[in-house]
Every structure is written in C-alpha cells, then in structure tokens.
Amino acid sequence: MRVAINGFGRIGRLVLQAMAEQKLLGKEFDVAAVVDLSTDARYFAYQLKYDSVQGKMGSSLSAPAEDILEVGGHRIKCVCGRGLKPSQLPWKDLGIEVVIEATGIYANESSYGHLEAGAKRVIISAPAKSSDASKPVKTIVMGVNEHEFDPAEHKVVSNASCTTNCLAPVVHVFLKEGVGIETGLMTTIHSYTATQKTVDGVSLKDWRGGRAAAVNIIPSTTGAAKAVGEVLPSTRGKLTGMAFRVPTPTGSVVDLTFRTEKETSVADLNAMLKKASESYLRGVLQYCDEDIVSADVIHNQYSSIYDSRATLQNNLPNEKRFFKVVSWYDNEWGYSNRVVDLLKFISQKR
C-alpha cells in the first residue's frame, strides 16, 4: 500500500519510525512521500536520527538527493507543501492510496481535499469533526470500536487523541465486564507539547496557556473524556474532564474518578483489566503492578498502561460504587503506534 505523510512534525516522524520499528516500512507499506514546509531531506534525516525524548532511530538514514529521504534503504520523496491545500498535493501522480494527515491543521472536512487530489483514504492523527454532513469523519479507537469501520462509507477517519486512546480502553473494559459507569470525571496530567510556549508569551484565547511550559503546571481544557462518548455511545453525557499541562516532555497519565452502575471492588476492577490486557485488548492495554513513574512509560507502545497499585475505593461505610483508576501513556509513541495499527487495519479492509 502506497502511503503519504502530510506534516513531518512530532507525530508524522514518529509514525514513520513506528513503521520502521514494526518492520513494515518498504514491506507492507510503501511510504512514497512526506510533506512539510521544505524538501530538505538531510534535515529530515537529522530530525529522525536524533530525538531528544524518544532516542536515536535504529534504521540507517541518508539523503541521496536534496528531496529524497532514505530510511533503512527505503526511498521517500520529500514534497514541499508550503502554500498548498490538500487538494493540490500530487497524490494522483504518486499513486498514493492512504494519506496520514499529521499537520494538525486539517482535522475536519477540509481533509477531504486529499481525496480530491487522488488519495483513496485519509487517517487524521488528531481528534476531528466535520461540519459538513456530506463529508463525515469517523472516529476510531483501536481496541474499542474498529469493528464499526465501513470501507464503503468511511473514507476519512480520525485516530482520536492520545488521551482518548488511553481512557477509552479502560472505560470499555468496565462496560464489557458489566459494572458500567454512571458518571465520571477525568483529569489528564499531560506533558507539554509544541502548541505551548517556551517562555511567557501572548495567548489571548487562553491566558494560562501562554505561560512558560517548562516551569509551570498549567490547567487546560480537553475534550478527551467527552470524546469517549463518540466511540462508546452508552457513556455519552456521563464523562467530562480537564487537563494539567506539566513540565515533562512526554509520558502522561489519566486519572478517572467514577461511580459504577453496579457494586464492585478494587480487586475485581483490577482483575477485569488484567484479563482484558491478556485477551481482547492485547497490544492496546498493558497491566502494570510495579511502582512506575512517567519516565518509565517513554517509548512504550501501548495506548494505556493501567497502574493497578494506584486504584482507590472511597472509604465511606458500605460504599462499593465510587472509585479512582489511573492509567499512563506515552502521548507521542503510544499514539503513533496506534496510527500505524489503524493503517494496518484499514489496509486489510480494502
């Protein structure tokens, strides 16, 4: 399958790296092009080789021509997207079948421009919504609702957010195992990202968001909890939450405080999640019973790393429905691996 990556930033590069680590590059997937603001293949090779958080890429890297990037012997054309809309990109000429839309800009119906340019499908590496009913965007969380994918109908799909990918599998287990969720509040303690400031700067819409990322804990908004309702409709209206952006470069954690529909216990909840991690959520949910911290989940490929030692039950007498669970995630690497998994899934449905 011929693939293009539009946007060669954090997620775009890590998706390519994940393909290489999974030994899919040049075999199951022919990444024919990457699009960014330049075609400087030498610089792209440098960015892939040296990563301040994820470490050095294991594949060989070179630039045999100014606009040709070579990764592990696989040649990729570098396309300059400066000033171009998705509909103006050379997908027809390059024979592109699937575009991974990783710019963060076209997370709506505008991503249909890739189809106009000749691609057959689009995966958006961000939460996405369409305001045009004739151009729907289907949200898929691997391990949770990929069975809803319809190849004939869903030409553009969203991989949701990294936080939704962490939270939704945990919620899915509680629903599938029968304890249910009556209501819940989620907090994500989230590493800073490229949208934040290195020093205090202008942020007219979000004053706190303009403060220096590396020296502050910054309250922020997130739609991740509400988005769970898109992939698990029975939770719609039951979950909401907020974020705290913290001074770590990657490695985040979700804290879900919730009330179950049926009485249960910490031991039972842990058992449910352990069972799921070994069966229907294998490869998506990891069960951990060790004393880990955020640095320990860097470069962990799972969507959600459940921390069984952190599970709490309200200590009121006879209270058997009020709990807190905690699950970690590498908001970069885990998410990028799910983009690749979604691509694999879609390729099998052609």
Swiss-Prot record:
Top-rank taxon, per record: Bacteria
Keywords: Cytoplasm, Glycolysis, NAD, Nucleotide-binding, Oxidoreductase
Record has Iron as a keyword: no
Binding-site list for D-glyceraldehyde 3-phosphate: 161-163, 193, 222-223, 245
Molecular-function GO terms, alphabetical: glyceraldehyde-3-phosphate dehydrogenase (NAD+) (phosphorylating) activity; NAD binding; NADP binding
Listed GO biological process terms: glucose metabolic process; glycolytic process
Catalytic activities: D-glyceraldehyde 3-phosphate + phosphate + NAD(+) = (2R)-3-phospho-glyceroyl phosphate + NADH + H(+)
Pathway: Carbohydrate degradation; glycolysis; pyruvate from D-glyceraldehyde 3-phosphate: step 1/5
Gene3D superfamilies reported in the protein's UniProt record: Dihydrodipicolinate Reductase, domain 2, NAD(P)-binding Rossmann-like Domain
Cellular compartments per GO CC: cytosol
EC number: 1.2.1.12
Annotated site location: Activates thiol group during catalysis: 190
Active site: 162
Keyword Cytoplasm among UniProt keywords: yes
Listed CDD domains: GAPDH_I_C (cd18126), GAPDH_I_N (cd05214)
NCBIfam families per the UniProt record, alphabetical: GAPDH-I
PANTHER family noted in UniProt: GLYCERALDEHYDE 3-PHOSPHATE DEHYDROGENASE (PTHR10836), GLYCERALDEHYDE-3-PHOSPHATE DEHYDROGENASE-RELATED (PTHR10836:SF76)
Family statement: Belongs to the glyceraldehyde-3-phosphate dehydrogenase family.
Protein name according to UniProt: Glyceraldehyde-3-phosphate dehydrogenase
